[in-house]
Design a protein with these regions (language model features):
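Catalytic P-loop NTPase motifs of RecA-like helicase/translocase cores
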Residues: 1, 49, 72, 77-79
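Short beta->alpha connector loops at strand-helix junctions that form conserved
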Residues: 14-18, 138
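Active-site phosphate-binding strand-loop segment of PLP-dependent enzymes
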Residues: 17-71
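Conserved beta-strand scaffold positions in the cores of enzyme catalytic domains, especially
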Residues: 11-14, 101
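Substrate-binding/gating loop at the entrance of the active-site cleft, primarily
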Residues: 1-9
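Conserved PLP-anchoring active-site segment centered on the Schiff-base-forming lysine
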Residues: 1, 24, 168-170
Length: 171
């Protein structure tokens, strides 16, 4: 995520890991000088290095206060965690908190590629126009798409629930 952000812009601000108050201070400082430009707060739903997770509702509340959008990368837990496989967004009942959700098909779904889900129409249009070169150069093959679909059907089934429960019991 950090490398992608650096490739996109030099205007990046960091705050302490899982530190909602630190994020609030950072956004307050940014908004003191800039009330117009968009701010994108990026987090993972599950940080793989230490298996910790942010409070998505708290992040969303701070984002709303400072007119920022919240992007949640659920690559590490989507399909693998929670009774329904919705990861920490589901466990925290926070599916409606993220403005943008991104994820990977290379983990739970055993393929390559990924997805992006966008709530805001303006952000959707922005991505449509400014990501066109990526869209047409990295399309999933029909076999990869079928593999993802088959894996998703397992994730959403009773078999998927049983497998996730068994996995959690083994930890």
């Amino acid at each position: 995520l950090q490398e992608g952000a650096r490739a996109a812009t030099g205007n990046i601000h960091f705050h302490g890991h899982l530190n909602v108050k630190g994020l609030e201070r950072r956004l307050q400082k940014i908004r003191q000088n800039d009330m117009e430009n968009a701010i994108l707060v990026v987090t993972e739903s599950l940080f793989s290095m230490h298996s910790d997770t942010p409070d998505i509702h708290a992040l969303k509340a701070v984002c709303d206060e400072y007119n920022a959008s919240l992007l949640v990368d659920c690559a590490h837990d989507f399909g693998a965690i929670g009774d329904d496989g919705l990861g920490h967004l589901g466990l925290q009942n926070a599916l409606d908190c993220a403005d943008i959700v991104i994820g990977s098909f290379s983990k739970t779904f055993a393929s390559n590629g990924g997805f992006i889900a966008v709530r805001n129409r303006a952000q959707k249009e922005y991505l449509k126009y400014y990501s066109a070169t990526q869209t047409f150069s990295n399309a999933l093959s029909p076999v990869q798409a079928a593999s993802v679909q088959a894996a998703f059907e397992i994730v959403a089934s009773q078999e998927g629930r049983d497998r996730r429960r068994s996995l959690m019991d083994n930890i």
